[in-house]
Each structure stands twice: as structure tokens, then as C-alpha cells.
Amino acid sequence: RGDFYSGQHVCLSCKAKQQAAQLAAKTEARRLAKETTKVMRAQAKKQAYDRKYDAEKRAQVSAQDAELARRTLAKRRLIEFTRRFHPDYQAGWVHRDVCRRLEQFLQDVVDKKSPRLMLFLPPRSGKSALVSVNFPAWILGQHPEMEIISSSYAVSLPITFSRKVRELVQDPAYQSIFPATHLDRSSASAEAWLTTQGGGYVASGVGTGITGKGFNIGIIDDPIKDAEEADSETVREKVWDWYSSTFYTRAAPGAGILVVLTRWHDADLAGKLLQRMKEDKAEGVSNLDDWQVISYPAIAVTDEWVNVDGTITEEPKTPQAIKVRNKGEALHPERFPVERLERIKQT
């Protein structure tokens, strides 16, 4: 049959087949396009899932790495250990400085150097939480074989400290940092308890006996309650007799003694110990107790620089010294502003 307009011969059957083939091709193309889109969407969804999974995995690994880093830091640094278990602890420069000195004190005990350290701090400066609770717990984490005696003017205080240290040692978070330190269940009273490695914590009141107990580290935290008691010569002599005849005799070879107090009187325990050291040096006594004294007044009486050798002086000894406060500044203004300290001083 011819095409009327073109005059060309057209096979209708062939044209129908051609159109059918084109339609089939278009249908197949649409099907393939749908399949391709479906596959691409599935791949995109899988890629998105993989990216999310990888991101979550990286975040998890990052969180685990961060946690391990925090544990390592808490194990190495006392101030970080304190912050980990007491997130609300208000740590100022003074607390960081005290922690640094306590770390060195512990190392000197390990090295059998018989360190003697006095820290003079005002009341309510956070010293007991640091010195009588966190420091002993940190010590036992690193050296569970060490024996610690903690003393204060009333035995109820070190017993309270002892309970807190014991609770810390049993805390799962503590165990994640110091997995080798465990409480000996057969000896776990609040007044005296042991670790499975033979170390432990003994609470003692000034003036009470410490029969049969020795120490690698002896802590005396405020041996006199307040200024009123410090004015009593009888009380001061009682403290001195207890120190020289009871506490001091319990020191193991190479043991360290740490005295932390508020100075209420020139002839208090610290005053007597420093006078004894002065006399021993004058007489050329060997193996004397050589006390390192660090004083942190509530209000700075001079500019204060911490030197590389640990001393705090009015002027820097070397360019590496760090200025911690100016004359007239409060020790820890976030806790006790200078205005409040001045009011307390006036009363």
C-alpha cells in the first residue's frame, strides 16, 4: 500500500512491529530507570546508615578514648582525681598547688626520704577534704600496701574521713582507675580498715593511743580545735606529749609526716616542731626532722610568686616563677571574697 502524500510504499505490519518494539523499549527503559532509582535509593540509604554507624562508632571510640584519658589523668594527678569524684569541688590555685606538693610528698615517701611537710591554711579552705580524704584514697590506689594514720583534735573527725575514704575505695569508678586496690572484708571498721595488700587507714584522735599501729604516712589535720583551745597551755602541752610519745613513735623507716593546720598560737604543735628543728640544726643533730613549711594566708600580706623550687616568695627567683596573687588578694576569692574575710578579721 502506498502513502497518499509521499507516494512511498508503506508496510503496515512492519510499522506496527516497529511501534511495538519502540513501546517495549520505552517500557523497558522506564522499568530499568525505576530499578536504577530503587537501587540508587537503597544504596544511598545504606550509605547514609553506614555514615551514621561509622559516626556513632567513631563517637563511641572517641568517648571511650576520652574516658580512658580522664582515668589516666585522675591516676596521675591528685587534683584531677579530686575533680572526678567531687565535680562541685571549688578548686583554686591554692588547691592545685597543695596537690602538687602532696604528689611530691608521696614520691619522697616512696623514695624513703622521710619527708616532713607543714601546710598552714585558714579555716574552711577545703583542706580536710583534700588532705584527709582524697589524698589517702589516691595514695592507696597507687600503693595499696601503704599504712596511713589520720589524726585530728577529735577522733570523730578522722573516723568520718575514714568512712569517706573507704567508700571511695569501694566505688566502681575508683575501681576502674585503681583495679588492684581492694578492701579487706575481714577488717573494715570505720576506725581502722585494711586493703587486701596489707595497707590501710587508721583514724586517731589527738591524745588517744595508737597501740600496735604504724604508718608510712602520718597525717595530722588540725590538732587543736580553735583559738580558745590554742590559748590553753595545758591543751598545747597535751598535743605535744601525744605527738612526741605516741604519734611520732609509730613512724616506719622513711615514713612521711604531714601537718596541716590553722595557726592559732605561736607555741602550737607547728611552732614547737619548728623550734625543735632550729635547735637540732644549731646543735648539729644528724637525721633531724627537716620541715618544709608552706603558708597560705587568707589575705596575701605581700605579692606571691611560686618558684620552680616550690617556695612562695614576694619576688620571683627566676623568670619561670608564676605569680599567683597580689598583696591584699584573697586566697580563694570564689569561695571567700576579700570583703568577707575583712569582716571576719574585724570580728
Each language-model region and where it sits:
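Cysteine-rich micro-motifs
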Residues: F4-K17
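N-terminal accessory segments
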Residues: L23-S114
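Phosphate/oxyanion-binding active-site loops and adjacent basic polyanion-contact surfaces
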Residues: Q90-H95, K127-S128, S132, R236-V239
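Conserved P-loop
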Residues: S114, L119-I177
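Residue-level preference for the first positions of well-ordered beta-strands
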Residues: R116-M118, E147-I149, G200, I217, ...
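Conserved nucleotide-state-sensing and coupling region of NTP-binding domains
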Residues: S151-I210
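Conserved RecA-like ASCE ATPase "motif II neighborhood" in helicase/translocase motors
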Residues: A190-T246
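Non-catalytic, compositionally simple segments
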Residues: E228-T347
